[in-house]
């Protein structure tokens, strides 16, 4: 299945949070998510973003994401850390994760 992989925009914040909650449910930790849509908007799309995010979209629905941020390696210099790569349960096994990971690599140092 081919998805549209694109950089997330502020209006995607609700979908991003829903995917995070879906992951937490899978990990049997649903109560651990204290992040809000406002937090995602502030820290991902505010004046000084702390993370970047790619989303996978199929038929105008966000069904996956790769959330990452810059860091510094004392051995390698600037790099990115992939915090989470999430694909909605009903779309797993369809190549969406591979498409997101490939796009992440292409957008990294």
Which residue stretches match the model-derived regions?
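Conserved GNAT-fold acetyl-CoA-binding loop/helix
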Residues: 20-43
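A short helix-loop-beta-strand connector motif used in the catalytic cores of GNAT acetyltransferases and
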Residues: 44-55
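Conserved acetyl-CoA binding element of GNAT-fold acetyltransferases
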Residues: 78-89
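Conserved beta-strand in the GNAT
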Residues: 55, 61-69
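Conserved acetyl-CoA-binding loop-helix of GNAT-fold acetyltransferases
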Residues: 87, 93-106
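A short beta-loop-alpha structural element at the N-terminal edge
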Residues: 4-18
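Conserved donor-binding loop and adjoining core beta-sheet/short helix segment
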Residues: 68-79
